Amino acid sequence: MKRILSIAVMASAVLGAAAQDTYESAKMADRDLNGTARYVGMGGAMEALGADISTISTNPAGPGLMRKSQVAVSFGPQIVSGDKQNVLDGPTTTFGLDQAGGVLVTKVGSNSFLNFGFNYTKSRNFNQLLTATDDFYFTSQNKISCMKYFAGAMKEYNYSVVDDLYNFVLNGVVNRDGNLEEDFVEYYNAAGYATEQRREGFIADYAFNVSGNVNDRVYLGLTFGLKDVHYRNTTYYTEALLDYTDENIIGNVDLLDERETSGTGLDIKLGVIARPIENSPFRIGAYVHTPTWYKLETTSSTDLSRDFDIYETDPKTGKEYLANNPKQRRHYTSLEYRLNTPWVFGLSVGHTIDQILALGLTYEYSDYTNLDNRVIDEDYYDYYYGEFFEDSHSDRLMKRNTRDVMQGSHTLKAGMEVKVTPEFSVRAGYNYVSPKYKSTGFRDQTIESQGTYLATTTDYTNWKSTNRITFGLGYAIGNFFMDAAYMYSQTDGDYFPFMLYQNDVNPELDCIPDAVKVSDKRSKLLFTLGWRF
């Protein structure tokens, strides 16, 4: 049987402190360390050293240091680690093309060059496995939906897909006569939950670059980027529900959500590298990335089912009857929207010693409170110019709460290369990326926005800092070169199945899920084949 509460009791309930739901959008703003094996092997700390194709997408001035044209292609496997999944079991190793590009070097003066480049890179690899399980104490997913409604927090644009599914399948809002029960709110507590998530896909970055130098002292570069998003996420979530005594398990409720996001984005990057001392190889680099202006579409199919019967009590006769709530309900959603990612600013230094040792250090900063979810307005046709136009506006409530959930992130990259012989090189690198999420942030399902209204899941993870270590080898003979790199990356986080709810009147109505420690661990092997001419 369900817990039944009158509206009068719930009228005085108050939701906990508000926070923002930008967790889905934030995935699109993350960037991975990827590129040529030389670049990855040195931890990506080449924004001042330059002379590598991968710097097209980081510091556009980098290709300006090249004195020979070159082409390169990079590929290799990536392994994601995670607990074994029983429902969404699949491959943990993927193999693909990570980089392909080239730079054409043209001499325009005695000491000046004008170079043109193109580079394809997987700037973001979404592949990830996540598994979490925990016990509940007077808590459940359907309970949080009930508390949300009867606390007066349920509005037109925050009545989510998840709320709708639980409403029809579990809450018993449809009586024997097919009418909506408005006098009572009903819910089940759960003994615990288990969840499995599988994320797949990537963001392809197509970068077009022009770079050059002035008297071999100052190097300038400009890159135009086109990004193509392919993201797929499958979530399985199950709860073991309890009867009214909170002692006996009566059955399970299962949610299966399949979500896909696709679209394109544009960005611009500017960079400069300078040698402040004429006879020294010491270099200083600086660069800036505009936001990526995305237009995206997300579609999802969400299914909720239960494996037990629900019985109601007739208020007139006191007899129980089998409720006519469906045991299963499916919901399809689709949403087009725009997303602007934060600006990126970077500084770098690099130095070489006797053409044997190369050292690089890079610092980047990006303020994720500037992540901007935008609502698309209606298209219109301008008959004067003969063109279609599309306007959008910032989701004001989403934007306000983004500042409460996200924060500025600092990235530090260090790398070195040693030429053991003129043909053979050894490389190593390290990255530290500070957290983008505040530890106090949570996915607020009470915000009146499209993001809440079309939410098909409620879970979130506050990811902490990222640490990467890299190693690499290089071999060159004549104009041909080949490189290999290994990278290990780890990001720990706190997983929550849904937001916290606290009732100021009756603590038994609280919904307080505990954090579950999760970790995103990745290993990658990368190989590059290239030719200079």
Which functions belong to the PLM regions below?
Residues M1-Y23, L529, F533:
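Bacterial Sec-dependent N-terminal signal peptides
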Residues Q20-N34, Y39-V40, D98, V105-F533:
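Outer-membrane beta-barrel porins/channels
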Residues D21-M46, P63-S81:
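Transmembrane beta-strand segments of Gram-negative outer membrane beta-barrel proteins
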Residues Y39, I53-T55, K68-S74, L97-Q99, ...:
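A common structural microfeature
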Residues V40-S54, Q85-D89, Y193-R199, D514:
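Asp/Glu-centered strand-loop micro-motifs enriched in Gly/Pro and often flanked by an aromatic residue
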Residues I56-G62:
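N-terminal periplasmic accessory domains that precede
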Residues Q78, G90-P91, T466-R468:
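Strand-loop-strand
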Residues K84-D98:
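Aromatic/His-enriched, Gly/Pro-containing loop or helix-boundary segments
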